[in-house]
Amino acid sequence: INIMNKFNKIVAIEPVSLIPEYEEKLKTLADEVVMYGDIPTDDDVIANRIGDADCVLLSYTSRLTAEAMAKCPNIKYVGMCCSLYSPESANVDIRYAEAHGIKVTGIRDYGDEGVVEYVVSELVRCLHGFGQPSWETMPREITGLKVGVVGLGKSGGMIADAMKFFGAEIAYFARGEKQAAAEK
């Protein structure tokens, strides 16, 4: 499905945190747009909200199950306003969607710089005691520190790079070997 085609009806089954400008742009993509401001309580509520919509938007707080989708045969597209890394980690039944010709997309690689900035700033606060008691009696630098990173995806890789920039020794755990990380 080309998501630039016009939909009949777009339903955001829960708050999806769109800025007002982009919420307005949704109206150019469908004849009708319905945005719910609360989190649905179960599959029946979700199915009722979707109704005859052909486009569904959701965030990370609700699950779009096979049971709910089966009650809504018009669904052609599900937009996850959150991360989609794998069918196993998704809050949408990706396998059901694929088997029924429903296109599902999510967001990848967003906010990574902010995550890295937060991790580095909190580590510096902890090591130096800025605004809180210091980790040890004497402030420490990141240089020479042994840092472990769990998960070497986009954010984890950027955190490892930032720590390496400051002179830390990096160790990581990931589901598979990361040759690029080993070479750094």
Q: What name fits each language-model region?
A:
Residues 26, 48-49, 68-71, 141:
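Structural alpha-helical scaffold elements that stabilize or flank donor/cofactor-binding regions
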Residues 7, 75, 143-146:
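Phosphate-coordination loops involved in phosphoryl transfer and adenosine-cofactor binding
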Residues 15-18, 38-41, 59-64, 83-86, ...:
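Short beta->alpha connector loops
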Residues 1-55, 167, 171, 179-180:
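N-terminal glycine-/charge-rich "phosphate-binding" loop or analogous flexible N-terminal tail
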